[in-house]
């Protein structure tokens, strides 16, 4: 709940391009944490794959214009995004470090219950400053989507992935988010497919492939 809440809060103060660039640091932070906690060793393929995937993300979110990244202005929202990076990396690393004696779905139930308790004070705080929810059809459709997919399906798959291949290799797949977003924008909003989309996709997919290789 901390990760999701802080992401939504940070986006009020920073650009999407800044947020995505900061989130691209999650695999690097996870590699550092898993090494410090002696959970998983890092190899040269993972480091090179991480570098390639970050280049690919930069290509997509900057529309192939490096000037957009060079002249970015960072702000308080970006600092909050760094909090997201730390919390998600720590969460992913601890999932591998501690073997929970409950099923994946039971663990998700515990997380959701704890998350609700954490979010209640935030709800009343926002209400106190005049932010109100509109309980209309759109609200309930969005709520259904968030509960069924990001809150249950995604967390289940994420936990299962870390259990099988470990945090270092799992977090590399986060780099696919900008690529999937670009593909969905092309399909749903009829945005034009550009060369930088192709270049970014090649770099990201190559980076993920390399990160899953093992040294001999």
Residue ranges, per PLM feature:
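Membrane-interface helix termini and inter-helical loops of multi-pass transporters
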Residues: 9-12, 61-74, 124-138, 142, ...
């Amino acid at each position: 709940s901390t990760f999701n809440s802080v992401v939504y809060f940070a986006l009020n103060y920073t650009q999407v391009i800044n947020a995505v660039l900061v989130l691209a640091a999650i695999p690097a932070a996870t590699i550092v944490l898993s090494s410090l906690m002696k959970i998983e060793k890092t190899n040269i393929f993972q480091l090179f794959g991480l570098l390639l995937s970050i280049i690919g993300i930069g290509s997509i979110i900057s529309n192939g214009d490096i000037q957009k990244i060079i002249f970015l202005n960072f702000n308080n929202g970006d600092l909050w995004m760094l909090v997201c990076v730390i919390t998600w990396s720590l969460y992913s690393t601890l999932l591998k470090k501690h073997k929970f004696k409950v099923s994946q779905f039971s663990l998700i139930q515990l997380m959701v219950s704890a998350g609700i308790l954490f979010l209640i004070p935030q709800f009343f705080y926002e209400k106190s400053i005049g932010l109100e929810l509109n309980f209309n059809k759109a609200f309930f459709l969005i709520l259904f989507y968030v509960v069924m997919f990001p809150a249950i399906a995604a967390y289940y798959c994420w936990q299962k992935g870390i259990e099988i291949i470990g945090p270092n290799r799992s977090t590399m797949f986060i780099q696919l988010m900008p690529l999937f977003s670009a593909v969905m924008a092309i399909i749903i909003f009829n945005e034009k497919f550009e060369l930088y989309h192709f270049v970014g996709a090649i770099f990201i997919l190559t980076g993920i492939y390399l990160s899953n290789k093992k040294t001999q």
